[in-house]
């Protein structure tokens, strides 16, 4: 879920997320309400300055049943901390930019924490062929995952909302440092040595290129 936090509220917002929300997210993971949760923030100075989104809440679920039946775990503040949620969340003001749900199609997970993640959106001309191609991409990335600094990768397809102006596919590339994330963007990192055939097929499936690519930094999370 993308959100906007005013500059003057950032310090207080992150404090609340780390001190209160993260422990409750850890409880939710333990109780099988969610699989993972994270707060990430946009690396400043990149992209369109008119796009004010600067944070995202990211939640992962084991299945649809878990997603639709999960409790509002973030509201358990009084039980856990003795403070009503309306007091904790009274400030700062947060502008929510909607909720977007994806189905993970391919994924690489490691036990190493990622510090930066590249978020990529595109609209393939043939979504099924793109998913199939990601099997070859995954095999290549797994060969380079240690030496490149990549600690996670995945590809997902959009479930909701759906309309003609929204990309249908989403990728994430998680790295240990900002430098290694930038290397990925210029064809190095885990991309290095990928076959010409894979690149050509990928570019053929997204002839207009990426719809959007941004870098976010990990703030806090639970898994």
Regions found by a protein language model. Give the residues of each.
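Short S/T/G/P-rich N-terminal loop/turn motif that feeds into the first structured element of a domain
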Residues: 1-77, 86-223
């Amino acid at each position: 879920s993308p959100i906007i936090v005013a500059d003057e509220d950032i310090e207080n917002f992150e404090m609340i997320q780390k001190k209160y929300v993260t422990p409750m997210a850890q409880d939710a993971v333990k109780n099988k309400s969610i699989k993972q949760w994270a707060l990430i923030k946009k690396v400043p100075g990149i992209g369109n300055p008119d796009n004010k989104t600067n944070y995202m809440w990211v939640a992962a679920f084991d299945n649809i049943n878990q997603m639709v039946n999960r409790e509002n775990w973030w509201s358990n503040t009084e039980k856990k901390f003795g403070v009503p949620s309306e007091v904790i969340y009274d400030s700062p003001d947060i502008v929510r930019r909607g909720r977007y749900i994806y189905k993970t199609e391919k994924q690489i997970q490691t036990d190493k924490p990622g510090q930066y993640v590249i978020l990529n959106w595109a609209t393939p001309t043939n979504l099924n062929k793109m998913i199939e191609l990601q099997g070859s991409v995954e095999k290549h990335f797994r060969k380079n995952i240690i030496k490149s600094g990549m600690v996670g990768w995945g590809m997902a397809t959009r479930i909701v909302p759906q309309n003609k102006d929204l990309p249908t596919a989403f990728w994430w590339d998680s790295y240990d440092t900002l430098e290694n994330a930038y290397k990925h963007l210029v064809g190095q990192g885990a991309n290095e040595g990928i076959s010409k055939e894979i690149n050509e097929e990928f570019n053929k499936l997204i002839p207009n290129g990426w719809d959007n690519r941004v870098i976010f930094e990990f703030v806090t999370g639970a898994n």
